[in-house]
Amino acid sequence: MIDVNNFHYMKIGLASPEKIRSWSYGEVKKPETINYRTLKPEKDGLFCERIFGPTKDWECSCGKYKRVRYKGMVCDRCGVEVTKSKVRRERMGHIELAAPVSHIWYFKGIPSRMGLLLDMSPRALEEVIYFASYVVVDPGPTGLEKKTLLSEAEFREYYDKYPNQFVAKMGAEGIKDLLEEIDLDEELKELRDELESATGQRLTRAIKRLEVVESFRNSGNNPSWMILDVLPIIPPEIRPMVQLDGGRFATSDLNDLYRRVINRNNRLKRLLDLGAPGIIVQNEKRMLQEAVDALIDNGRRGRPVTGPGNRPLKSLSHMLKGKQGRFRQNLLGKRVDYSGRSVIAVGPSLKMYQCGLPKEMALELFKPFVMKELVQREIATNIKNAKSKIERMDDEVWDVLEDVITEHPVLLNRAPTLHRLGIQAFEPTLVEGRAIRLHPLVTTAYNADFDGDQMAVHVPLSKEAQAEARMLMLAAQNILNPKDGKPVVTPSQDMVLGNYYLTLERKDAVNTGAIFNDTNEVLKAYANGYVHLHTRIGVHANSFNNPTFTDEQNSKILATSVGKIIFNEIIPDSFAYINEPSQANLERTTPDKYFVDPTQLGEGGLKEYFDNTELIEPFNKKFLGNIIAEVFNRFSITDTSMMLDRMKDLGFKFSSKAGITVGVSDIVVLPDKQDILDEHEKLVERVTKQYNRGLITEDERYNAVVEIWTDAKDQIQGELMQSLEKTNPIFMMSDSGARGNASNFTQLAGMRGLMAAPSGKIIELPITSSFREGLTVLEYFISTHGARKGLADTALKTADSGYLTRRLVDVAQDVIVREEDCGTDRGLLVSDIKEGTEMIEPFIERIEGRYSKETIRHPETDEVIIRPDELITPDIAKQITDAGIEQMYIRSAFTCNTRHGVCEKCYGKNLATGEKVEVGEAVGTIAAQSIGEPGTQLTMRTFHTGGVAGSDITQGLPRIQEIFEARNPKGQAVITEIEGVVDDIKLAKDRQQEIIVKGANETRSYLASGTSRLKVEIGQSVERGEVLTEGSIEPKNYLSVAGLNATESYLLKEVQKVYRMQGVEIDDKHVEVMVRQMLRKVRIIEAGDTKLLPGSLVDIHNFTDANRDAFKHRKRPATAKPVLLGITKASLETESFLSAASFQETTRVLTDAAIKGKRDDLLGLKENVIIGKLIPAGTGMRRYSDIQYDKATAPVTETSEEVETIE
């Protein structure tokens, strides 16, 4: 067997007949499989033990030799070698075909490789191969052209005239003769000459043929190997036959297909021996050809061969294709041992890095470890005894299990795993029951809830795997979201509500204005019921020992509330005392206004002071998130995770104490709701009257009515929010960010508003009732449209978004950080991304975490803010924007020169850790996940704006797909191809608008539809590639007009526009990585003196290499233009055939690769997963595995001190 980790590339090619025979261990002569009486394989049959090896370990067929001691003997009675039965998985056989047959992949694939090589049409080939026509192999004196087709009658006629003077053949034999006669060098020369002169269709045909001829010549494949003389038979264990309960047999379809081939082949041999008439032999040969076609790719030609119940049989090609094929089912996604799954329940008492494992599950998962430990501790005498103890679940087993699982992390995964946070590592603790306990804060990352979700557990076995799980995957380490670098573990729901309730202040709380000496005194008073959580009190400032308080502040009294004192207990000591939810208080110091000078107080003391000051807002979800981000910026990840745990415990404790519930009485109905409705009803009547008089059009009336009702809803919403009390439970829930929002509340208490019809158009009759009042039958019916649409949309969206992620991962999986610095001299100019006046992504967000490409000086003081190749930290980014600088050059993935990946400097910081990115990080996969994961949050619908604008703009998920697949967008914009001035805009025929642009040398006119809005006016000067009308630009066209850099920036902007409009933040670098993958190919226009083929797609690096070579030898370089490929196309065009074949169109990719003799250097992740090597990312990179240990010089150090264990 080959050692998987020891080979560096994989090559594929056509197999010669000799090669096939060399693989084989013997010829299969009979179609029999198993003897139904003895259940032994038949001799010379498809399962023959002599050919494929014994069915039982170390035992020959007849039973003469048994046991290992006869290893390697060949039995003299039955001829079976005594060896392991495992060889039946690897030994192949063969069939010697009585007549050559063509391989259907090469003859039938599109384009037909055989046809291109012979310069014959696939129709003609089919006629010859399936015995409908003769092909002239050697014309002799007949005057016929070689490769001419003759019908039966024509052949007879010529044969009578010129007996035995010319050769014409039928079937694959004729094609084989023609293929053997091809002189590849000669063909190449002729084709290259033809390229010089040919044009149009002949040129394209010549280029296609040149590609195939070149492939055969370079790969060393012989064209005649496309015709098979010998057929390989795959090992029997891979096409098994098993007995079912009823004595019947279940068998793989391949056996049926092989049986048909063998039967027909044997019949043909017999006919040839008997010297049967030509027509019978021909018919049999055709049937053999069809049988082999069905075996290789059933259903590719004609009707597929069916088994029982009219089910098409699965041929060899089907074994590879699709989700159930070999690639995706067994090579890329294997099931693993040491895994379990169960329902999840919440574990509020767990620490951030812990999870609860059910006892029984843990025992089963860690069984081998426990068995080993039981034997070592001499609790069990041997392994067998240990096993039975575990199965009986004896008492002593549990203590051992406790010890085994300490410090042994396990991985928890929830499907669908949309991004890297879908699998995280935890330290297990044993729990009773059968549910896995999950820490409440990691639910956001998993997108899990506790309504019956299930999760899977996996055990990392090796020490290295455990170390990686602990260092890289521990939940406490994964606090930031890789897509935008913001914390992903923020408190939610109950935790938010508890902290909100805790920091609430109330005017009428008991003992307001009491003054305390220190916090201990406050907590005692609270415990004894002297003050309430919401009581506003004073505490001597110096008792806090807070480093941010000034001396003056320390001499005063801090005015705060009991709840805030409790809240500040969990905040790190070096922080300011947090008294109000503001960034200033959080980042700098507690505002002066909260410090009261005791000497300045009036008669009423502190109570009077509180009566005259406003209440401070409680801390909501957003502010809690900001606190966590600030702690993360100042301290380590460990401190942050401890802080999160404290915040969680506090939240749960006080949301329990608050006892906040929702009842019908909490929904307050507006008294003047009816008045608002009547008022708007009158407005609608007015509009209808205007329409009836013919003053406005139907569209204008409709838009006005929709606007009136929207306004009514807004007005009701506004008044509702005003009328709510601050202590209303529903208001508290929505205000704190725990659950719900203003719109939900309006529907409960105000009115439901306008609904959309199934077409997406808004129904102009509003639902005026609220849920509190109850809906009428008609209103209920109208609202079902929206509900159903919502559910259908969600289901479709999930599938679409998953498929998008799969394509994105596929195209970017080989982008890995390969080096520290690529030394590029280019950069990307960045500034605000705006759409009209609307800000999409501000400049500061685009530069933070990136490396600068230029020196930036302060425009006034001229001091250097940052030099080239330095990291732009949040502080520096703020300095740059504060200095009034609006654009700068940064290092970007777009301009990176690294082959097969990016370099550290062009990528910037790793958003998941906040540190600089390290060599070996699989940034392509992270980028794909970051773009794909929020896909489910995007909307599906194309907005029907209706009315005046009239154009449907695609948004949401369909727009993202449109961009990444580089399709022509809906609602296309017209762009100018020349620089100049807009000379005139006039009406053309068919109600179109004609825009005339006058340049320096030429004038161009562009047609736009009558309804599209123009973005230019007469006399305006326009740049090349500027848009003349509103809409989306067609990217492929834009590439040829405006060039590479403009197209990259445009695609980046478009992707950001879609996500930001839906409120999803994704960092630029992820989009850059993806867009760069779409633009890595060029199409050769002229080959010059290089070996490149005109019209072919070539990797940009290979193109520059070829030209560098040409310049070196003073030859003519090639010219090419950049090509924009959609992600599906780009994945299939990748250098690695394994990756492409496992993605889509498996047979086409493999056919192509075999002819070219392609070599896969295993650079990406997917290729290595397929063959079972470690992936070349992280610690699996070659630079880490090629280390030599020098044993002789390594110093040996003895450690004698006791090692302390740190708690």
Curated annotation (Swiss-Prot):
It comes from the Bacteria. Zn(2+) 2 binds at C822, C896, C903, C906. One of its GO terms (molecular function) is magnesium ion binding. The RNAP catalytic core consists of 2 alpha, 1 beta, 1 beta' and 1 omega subunit. When a sigma factor is associated with the core the holoenzyme is formed, which can initiate transcription. PANTHER family: DNA-DIRECTED RNA POLYMERASE, DNA-DIRECTED RNA POLYMERASE SUBUNIT BETA. Belongs to the RNA polymerase beta' chain family. This is DNA-directed RNA polymerase subunit beta'. It comes from Staphylococcus epidermidis (strain ATCC 35984 / DSM 28319 / BCRC 17069 / CCUG 31568 / BM 3577 / RP62A). The lineage of its organism: Bacteria, Bacillati, Bacillota, Bacilli, Bacillales. The gene is rpoC.
